[in-house]
Amino acid sequence: MAKNQINFTKMSKEASTQLKSFKESALALAVEDLRFKAEMKPLKAQLESILANRQNDIDNGLPVDEVIAKFPRTEVDNAIRKAQTTHEAIIEPLNKTMRDTYAFIPENMYLAYTKKIDEHKRGDFLTAISDFLTNLGIDGCTQGQISKLAENMSDMFGARYAQSKKIVENGTMHTAISKAQFNKLFMAVFCDMYIK
């Protein structure tokens, strides 16, 4: 093992299980998202067709009540609602499983990240990375190991284009991502890089 590599085999069994659950949930969410989009695409097309036909007949002078009866959308609306309900029932426990893994992220991690983005100060971020490793059950890392991990992970994080309000009020054109986005991204980057 190279000098600046962290021995992740020291990770607690609970942490290892949670991180694997994060990866499995992320994959399951992606699969479900694709399934849901595939199911919704023809339903949305069907609804758009009904609405276009309705508008065409209304534009041609037919009474609204007659047009609604001629092109009912109840069946499509019910199918859309059913698809959405099924989708939400599938993703809810997966999202919860992912959020449960955020327990390993120190409370100050997001604040340290925003300080790194906004003020270009890394010290708090390095401390938060060290705390994260401790939360995983990995103690005794050197400053070099922590710095290397922080640097490797930081390459995957970023800022985003600021909203108009922030640009106008502060003259700042970039900003940190939200805490929810950061937590999800942090765990995803960590798992991609270090959990096999």
Regions found by a protein language model. Give the residues of each.
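Charged, polyampholytic interaction/assembly segments that form long, compositionally biased interfaces
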Residues: 108-196
